[in-house]
Amino acid sequence: MTFESFTVLPAVDMQDGQVVQLVQGERGTERTYGDPVDAATDWVAAGAEALHLVDLDGAFEGARANATAVEDILDATDVSVQVGGGIRSAEDATALLDRGVDRVILGTAAIETPDIVGEIAAAYSDGVLVSLDAKDGEVVVEGWTEGTGMDPVAAAQRYADLGAAGILFTDVDVEGKQEGVRTDPVRDLVDSVDIPVIASGGVATVDDVRALEAAGAAGAVVGTALYEGNFTLADAQAAVED
């Protein structure tokens, strides 16, 4: 998938073998929503064209504890899949891409070793998304627990130059709070790079989805709002097709 049109990606965030949603990325705030494979197949049955999978144990601990669930989702679905969480080396990324993942999401690894982006992109031109998670205007890593001192716009430009196929921007300040999105940070990123920007964090209504599309985002990752039934996936897709 090249995000030629705005795409709504249901989030399948995994922790201890279960689908969860966190508030502002903080452990201990999770709501649990069952089996990851069941969730993924349900979203595909509901019309999802792409899925966003995150191994939260990998993001927090560095070890991909939910790797088997990712494999099972790949076997059970036939849509575009992007995967993040615990991908700390080119070898980790390559193994996932060879297995059939469409895009790997690099966060901490890209910050610590920027050249890894170009290394992977050289072999998989559309295979690397760089995750820029921002809290109080600063890029954060290690499961959103450590600041980097990096400005999101400057970071996005750097990774675009290194060959990233897109930027996954998470606004941690509104993530999981169900209080709406902030479009200014998204628009700033969209205006600064020529690669797709996928937005995550804060979506509570279909109007939020529309707002992200209007801000120029190529897609939106939606989690809590879908799991809590604020609106359906079909509602969100229809909102950006009008």
Curated annotation (Swiss-Prot):
Protein name (database record): 1-(5-phosphoribosyl)-5-[(5-phosphoribosylamino)methylideneamino] imidazole-4-carboxamide isomerase
Enzyme class: isomerase
Major place of residence: cytoplasm
Gene Ontology MF terms: 1-(5-phosphoribosyl)-5-[(5-phosphoribosylamino)methylideneamino]imidazole-4-carboxamide isomerase activity; oxidoreductase activity, acting on the CH-CH group of donors
This enzyme's EC code(s): 5.3.1.16
InterPro entries: Aldolase_TIM, Dihydroorotate_DH_CS, His_biosynth, HisA_bact_arch, Isoase_HisA-like, Isoase_HisA-like_bact, RibuloseP-bd_barrel
Position of the signal peptide: none
SUPFAM superfamilies membership: Ribulose-phoshate binding barrel (SSF51366)
GO cellular component assignments: cytoplasm
